[in-house]
Amino acid sequence: MLAGVLTALALIPEVISFSVIAGVDPQVSLIASVVLCLAMSIFGGRPAMVTAAAGSVALVIGPMVHQHGVGYILPAVILAGIIQILFGLCGMARLMRFIPPAVMTGFVNALGILIFFAQVPHFWSRQPLIVGLFVLTLLIILWAPRVIKAIPAPLIAIVALTLYTATTGQLLPTVGDEGSMSGGLPGFTALTVPLNLTTLQIIWPCALSIAFVGLMESLLTAKLVDDLTHTPSNK
């Protein structure tokens, strides 16, 4: 239970930052992560697995959202899921052994670089305090695990610096500025775009990218967990 609570708390700042990259309300990524965690706990390839909104997928979805709107996310994700099911039926996981380790390393590092540059516009500011908080957050994340191992370092940084800005009365941009955080569960939203060839032309490049990136990340993570636990995952 403790592991589940700590994981949930660690995911909150992560998925909120990814929602900013994707150009959607933070509440959207939070609810999506809840659904993903529940689905993973039931249908996951191994016990005690969790998942949530991924920065790599946010990078793929972001350009489509900015160009065409949020309404195209749902059909794009549905199409990506269908593509991944087809990949699974075709035994795509078995082909992973033919990919050189250098390609895997380059893939992961490239995603990290893209996520970094996607955050730069939010970091670049004329307010020196924002730059200082950014640097202090990095230092806490790097050094906190050496002292406190029971609480995730990103959570420590967010709580500590949020309390600092709130108690000192600093007027800074907040997550609430990116979208509404009403605190209630949203209702089901039907498709807001027509299901026709025009929509398919818009979503299929994004859906294919989501499918490939999601598959690569999942298989890479599964391999890493297999190596750490010395047990096989159901790929």
Predicted features by range, described:
Residues M1-K235:
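Transmembrane helical cores of multi-pass ion-transport proteins
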